Curated annotation (Swiss-Prot):
Stated name of the protein: Enolase
Enzyme Commission code(s) on record: 4.2.1.11
Enzyme class: lyase
Organism (species): Anaeromyxobacter dehalogenans (strain 2CP-C)
Cofactor note: Binds a second Mg(2+) ion via substrate during catalysis.
Entry binding sites for Mg(2+): 242, 287, 314
Superkingdom, natural source: Bacteria
Main localization category: cytoplasm
Length: 429
């Protein structure tokens, strides 16, 4: 009854006003699943390919008509008749049809749209919410939100080099209370910034994007906001960084250039810089602390801080099991960021999560800077027992939609649900 009977696609807009792919998959029960594909601003060099049209006369070359056509003309004929409930077989068919390592023929945005829409159609046909359909009866853990309340780097036009400064409400009893905590700190931060004469416009992910003197000043104003909101730093609320270090790494010179504060580091110097920040502030997680191909500095960072902090590989791993396996083998990082569009199918995403968990790595489900109203990743965070989710600040509907879905899931789970809290961070146990 969950045989795929129709697949269609269209071009829609994401939260940055750029085109993206939306797919609908219909199954024999009459149920339809719809999925919209996200898009990143700072993308890893090793990510699956997001197919764009390249026609500068239309959407500045960012149109996705080619990807849409590939769904309708290439993928649909190949998957109609397949069982949407057999996710692995469906994804394998599309991957084989593409035949390239990075899904560059059909586009990862085309393949992923079909993959996610089919899962949603099958879930509806089985009368199950997506988190239960994908995760089974054991899916009951609500993730800790890593809320990006202050933006720098590629996500904002400012002189702050680190891309994301996040508050982590890990000491609250429920997801709903954690979300309230994050929202109240977000509003308190606006007052703090206004008091300093700083701008309170927001970046791609809903966090403020002020021009501050240094990365450390960004941490200091967030600490002030936590206190003004009435929460205890370190106990109730911690901090997390997404450094996006590949964005400020000079590959030729082998140096990390923090231009906003006029500092230049080699690998050892960068590790010590992070260690000093972690000693001064209640930082529990550092993401993309080193360049995506600087395995040597990643190793140094893991040896120096891996026993104390969560070290997350995003651009380093790009949700790819081959790169993750290398990291596990070399003892690099202790966590992986999970982005469905980095690898381009639900099956491969789930494989990466399983590999990480087997190795004792934590997993963080994540949005992209270009998002839509689609809430799939909220369900996947619960389904995969990730324990943590990154989906932006307490503003912009494209971010809030995911938080609201998690509120619904927590309500639906009732007493069987649990908020991951501090236990989500293995390095803190």
């Amino acid at each position: 009854m969950t045989e795929i009977i129709n697949v269609t696609a269209r071009e829609i807009l994401d939260s940055r006003g750029n085109p993206t792919v939306e797919v609908e998959v219909a199954v024999g029960t009459g149920d339809v699943g719809r999925a919209a594909v996200p898009s990143g601003a700072s993308t890893g060099e090793h990510e699956a390919l997001e197919l764009r049209d390249g026609d500068k006369a239309r959407y500045l070359g960012k149109g996705v008509r080619k990807a849409v056509a590939n769904v309708i003309d290439e993928i649909a004929p190949a998957v109609v008749g397949l069982d949407a409930s057999d996710q692995a077989a469906l994804d394998a068919r599309m991957i084989a049809l593409d035949g390239t390592p990075t899904k560059s023929k059909l586009g990862a945005n085309a393949i992923l749209g079909v993959s996610l829409a089919a899962a949603k159609a099958a879930a509806t046909a089985h009368g199950l919410p997506l988190y239960r359909y994908v995760g089974g009866a054991g899916a009951r853990t609500l993730p800790v939100p890593l809320m990006n309340i202050l933006n720098g780097g590629a996500h904002a036009d400012s002189n702050v080099d680190i891309q994301e400064f996040m508050v982590v409400p890990l000491g609250l009893p429920t997801f709903a209370e954690a979300l309230r905590c994050g929202a109240e700190i977000f509003h308190a931060l606006k007052k703090v910034l206004k008091g300093k004469g700083a701008a309170t416009g927001v970046g791609d992910e809903g966090g403020y994007a002020p021009s501050l003197a240094s990365n450390e000043e960004a941490l200091a104003v967030i600490m002030e906001a936590i206190g003004q909101a009435g929460y205890e730093p370190g106990k109730q609320v911690a901090l997390a960084l997404d450094c996006a270090a590949s964005e400020f790494y000079d590959k030729k010179a082998g140096k990390y250039e923090l231009e906003g504060e006029g500092k230049s580091f080699d690998g050892k110097g960068l590790v010590e810089y992070y260690a000093q920040l972690a000693a001064k502030y209640p930082i529990v997680s550092i993401e993309d602390g080193c360049d995506e191909d600087d395995w040597a500095t990643w190793k140094l960072l893991t040896e120096r801080l891996g026993g104390k902090l969560q070290l997350v590989g995003d651009d380093l791993f790009v949700t790819n099991v081959t790169r993750l396996a290398r990291g596990i083998e070399q003892g690099v990082t202790n966590s992986i960021l999970v982005k469905v569009n980095q690898i381009g199918s639900l099956t491969e995403t789930l494989e990466a999560v399983r590999m990480a968990h087997r190795a004792g790595y934590t997993t963080v489900m994540s949005h992209r800077s270009g998002e839509t109203e689609d809430t799939t990743i909220a369900d996947l965070a619960v389904a995969c027992d990730c324990g943590q989710i990154k989906t932006g600040s307490a503003s912009r509907t494209d971010r809030i939609a995911k938080y609201n879905q998690l509120l619904r899931i927590e309500e639906e789970l009732g007493t069987s649900g649990r908020y991951a809290g501090r236990s989500a961070f293995k390095a803190l146990r």
